[in-house]
């Protein structure tokens, strides 16, 4: 069900089944007055596939009955269904895209038949059948308790608009990129006994290698703690805000990997402070179209190290795109 004949993955525009144009990147959910009275959708049992944005923009939708033959719930399939408060997922489910229920901020109750061979639901969390991987969190939950069986939290798992508090279980050891990229998330706790990750100040980090996993903004600022040694695009999330006004990077940070500045974004009028006497090592695939150091803002460095940081920026072909200042 849905439009696919002329629309490709990654297109900015797409259509719902009623012809409403959807542009997720710019907040257009496809709503039209012509389908404002639709409150229930029943997908026939013969349907095996949904297309992206198929039922996006049904803002008054309250009930959905999905075909149990559906294996994948694609991106923005029910984007903007603001009154949808519960859903029973199909028992053939193998994959759910993180934006499948984007902006469904009332969706708190999720159920799934025990007959599903690949997944199960607990605490509003969609898990792998063995409980070790967290794939997705119901987007209407304000408080999330990650089950103790979970070890891996997948990309964008709890990146929604309403979550304010997350409690991580004892076995969580792997948190993927943007897992907790939520502007209202102010509080992340870790249960006692976790041997791999820890919290200090505004940071959730890996105790074994010092990689920052989640930065929690406070007053639009993030001060990275001295336990952190590495910023890595593959695992990093910023919680509590979209754009920081100040980011402090301590001397303990020795490595910057990939496009980490896209994970922790600082506003163009903001400031970044590098406190290390030596600039961190820059890693990542060589891509001339990508800059792996902060640009288009003010960057503050130790006065005695100004020349070193200038050489560092020059080596990245980025010196002309940054305003370097010294820490007083």
PLM ranges: what are they?
Residues 31, 51-54, 74-77, 98-100, ...:
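Consensus positions within tandem repeat domains that build extended binding/scaffold surfaces
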Residues 7-20, 26:
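A composition-driven surface/loop motif
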Residues 23, 29-32:
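Short beta-strand-turn/beta-hairpin segments enriched in glycine/proline and small hydrophobics
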Residues 1-12, 33-49, 58-72, 81-95, ...:
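Structural signature of tandem-repeat unit edges
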Residues 179, 259-260, 284-292, 307-323:
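Short, aromatic/basic amphipathic alpha-helical patches
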